[in-house]
Regions:
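Alpha/propeptide regions of enzymes that mature by internal proteolysis
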Residues: 1-191
Length: 191
């Protein structure tokens, strides 16, 4: 009888080829996380919550012409954090990756953000720091990465306690593998 078990690292990187990179800035108390692999891949999305902030997630619908993506970004910074995917796109374009339009390749990097603007970090910057955070996260992709207060989880909170970045994997036999990565920044009281 086949049974469920966690992957060797209990991480999304237990899924063949997937890599994750984190970058954060302790001064602004925010960061970005990138999920990618060496080749494009398929993805899907479910958008929930009262005020979701996303970019390029519409392309993940099965009726769209873009079948594969090149990366996914999770970032803090509310709407400012969506710029982290621009930094990742710069890196991918430098590797000649992306959706081939016939003229140029356009890296497809859906992203989602969390609200960490009231966590006590410095937010009076004049130049949006998230493009650079996205680039730095991409340059650090690996099959081994930090969870907790790293990357998109750096400034995440759950009301009065710390939120953060988490990951898991589950295998059903040798053929079915599921991985997840999440930046938890919920509202309400944990008590």
């Amino acid at each position: 009888m086949t049974k469920l078990s966690n992957g060797p690292k209990n991480s999304i990187t237990d899924i063949d080829g997937f890599l994750v990179g984190n970058a954060h800035d302790d001064h602004i108390k925010s960061g970005a996380t990138v999920l990618t692999r060496s080749t494009s891949f398929r993805a899907s999305v479910s958008i929930l919550g009262g005020a979701p902030g996303t970019k390029e997630t519409e392309l993940l619908s099965p009726d769209k012409i873009v079948e594969n993506i090149d990366g996914i970004v999770l970032a803090g910074g509310s709407a400012f954090g969506l710029d982290a995917s621009s930094g990742v796109m710069d890196c991918l374009r430098g590797q000649n990756r992306g959706f081939d339009t016939g003229a140029i390749k356009v890296p497809i990097v859906p992203s989602a953000i969390l609200f960490d603007l009231k966590n006590g970090g410095f937010k009076e910057w004049s130049i949006n720091p998230y493009r650079e955070l996205g680039q730095n996260a991409f340059l650090k992709v690996s099959d081994d990465f930090e969870i907790g207060s790293s990357g998109a989880g750096c400034g995440a909170t759950t009301s009065v306690v710390k939120g953060g970045l988490g990951t898991s994997s589950i295998f059903y036999g040798h053929r079915i593998k599921v991985g997840a990565i999440v930046a938890v920044n919920s509202v309400g009281s944990p008590c």
